[in-house]
């Protein structure tokens, strides 16, 4: 006995297959390899092969947030204060951003490119008056702001984010 697969059956089963595939991706969850997240001590690899960045430690002493990084470049990269951002979220969901020239310093703060396969250990310091009221504190590292020699080709969708809230709340001095 044979079965003739009609056009109607084909369309019906094709639609069911499409729904099943779409549904399975919602159930498994998705992570974006271009935007990894972690906490203090985590090594993140934003951009799938651009670099490996580790936030070694984060402390706060009433007015200054200090973060120590270990960044291993896999391609030629700039590493300066424009590549870092600190996001502070308060109880009423107000977000305050510190980036570039807004109270951020980086040592070393080189405008030159670091060659591929170079290890750099920058220290980020940010002048922030009061973190005691913060509900969430995140440090963001953007390895490439734009394509080499092309300021119009932005890479700002590739970054790593560390949630440092627990580490900082443990170092706040009263």
Model-derived regions: residue spans:
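Low-complexity, acidic Ser/Thr/Pro/Gly-rich terminal tails and inter-domain linkers that flank the onset
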Residues: 36-61
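A structural detector for beta-sheet-dominated domains
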Residues: 47, 54-56, 72, 80-82, ...
